[in-house]
Regions:
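Short amphipathic alpha-helical segments that predominantly mediate membrane engagement
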Residues: 1-60
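Charged low-complexity stretches with an acidic bias
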Residues: 55-88
Length: 88
Protein backbone atom coordinates (compact mmCIF):
# COMPACT_ATOMS: atom_id res chain seq x y z
CA UNK A 1 0.00 0.00 0.00
CA UNK A 2 2.69 2.50 0.96
CA UNK A 3 4.63 1.63 -2.19
CA UNK A 4 1.60 2.61 -4.29
CA UNK A 5 1.39 5.87 -2.34
CA UNK A 6 5.07 6.42 -3.08
CA UNK A 7 4.50 5.79 -6.79
CA UNK A 8 1.53 8.19 -6.78
CA UNK A 9 3.59 10.86 -5.01
CA UNK A 10 6.37 10.35 -7.54
CA UNK A 11 3.90 10.83 -10.40
CA UNK A 12 2.68 14.01 -8.72
CA UNK A 13 6.27 15.23 -8.37
CA UNK A 14 6.92 14.63 -12.08
CA UNK A 15 3.86 16.72 -12.96
CA UNK A 16 4.98 19.48 -10.59
CA UNK A 17 8.43 19.43 -12.19
CA UNK A 18 6.81 20.75 -15.35
CA UNK A 19 5.49 23.78 -13.44
CA UNK A 20 8.99 25.02 -12.60
CA UNK A 21 10.03 27.87 -14.85
CA UNK A 22 12.63 26.90 -17.45
CA UNK A 23 14.86 29.72 -16.17
CA UNK A 24 15.08 28.00 -12.76
CA UNK A 25 17.46 25.34 -14.03
CA UNK A 26 18.90 24.66 -10.58
CA UNK A 27 15.55 23.71 -9.09
CA UNK A 28 14.63 21.64 -12.13
CA UNK A 29 17.92 19.74 -11.89
CA UNK A 30 17.50 19.11 -8.15
CA UNK A 31 13.98 17.84 -8.63
CA UNK A 32 14.98 15.58 -11.54
CA UNK A 33 17.71 14.06 -9.34
CA UNK A 34 15.18 13.45 -6.58
CA UNK A 35 12.81 11.76 -9.03
CA UNK A 36 15.67 9.51 -10.19
CA UNK A 37 16.53 8.56 -6.60
CA UNK A 38 12.89 7.75 -5.83
CA UNK A 39 12.69 5.63 -8.97
CA UNK A 40 15.83 3.77 -7.83
CA UNK A 41 14.12 3.10 -4.51
CA UNK A 42 11.08 1.70 -6.28
CA UNK A 43 13.20 -0.44 -8.60
CA UNK A 44 15.69 -1.63 -5.95
CA UNK A 45 13.76 -1.79 -2.67
CA UNK A 46 16.48 -3.78 -0.91
CA UNK A 47 19.32 -1.36 -1.65
CA UNK A 48 20.01 0.46 1.65
CA UNK A 49 22.56 2.81 0.06
CA UNK A 50 19.85 4.30 -2.16
CA UNK A 51 17.50 4.62 0.82
CA UNK A 52 19.95 6.57 2.98
CA UNK A 53 20.96 8.82 0.10
CA UNK A 54 17.33 9.45 -0.80
CA UNK A 55 16.22 10.40 2.71
CA UNK A 56 19.15 12.75 3.22
CA UNK A 57 18.56 14.45 -0.12
CA UNK A 58 14.79 14.69 0.37
CA UNK A 59 15.12 16.33 3.76
CA UNK A 60 17.60 18.87 2.44
CA UNK A 61 15.74 19.70 -0.74
CA UNK A 62 12.39 20.11 1.00
CA UNK A 63 13.74 23.28 2.62
CA UNK A 64 15.05 24.55 -0.73
CA UNK A 65 11.65 24.26 -2.39
CA UNK A 66 9.62 25.52 0.57
CA UNK A 67 9.62 29.22 -0.37
CA UNK A 68 9.55 29.20 -4.19
CA UNK A 69 7.62 25.98 -4.74
CA UNK A 70 5.47 25.16 -1.67
CA UNK A 71 3.44 22.48 -3.46
CA UNK A 72 6.63 20.64 -4.39
CA UNK A 73 7.86 21.00 -0.81
CA UNK A 74 4.63 19.45 0.52
CA UNK A 75 4.93 16.57 -1.94
CA UNK A 76 8.52 15.96 -0.82
CA UNK A 77 7.38 15.95 2.82
CA UNK A 78 4.70 13.43 1.86
CA UNK A 79 7.34 11.22 0.24
CA UNK A 80 9.53 11.39 3.36
CA UNK A 81 6.54 10.32 5.48
CA UNK A 82 5.81 7.40 3.15
CA UNK A 83 9.44 6.27 3.24
CA UNK A 84 9.40 6.41 7.03
CA UNK A 85 6.26 4.24 7.06
CA UNK A 86 8.10 1.81 4.78
CA UNK A 87 10.83 1.63 7.41
CA UNK A 88 13.45 3.45 5.42
Amino acid sequence: MAEKELKDALDKLVVELETIDQSDAGSRTMLKQLVELIELKLNEPGNKEHHDQLLDKLKGETVHFEVKHPLISRTLEEIVAILVRLGI
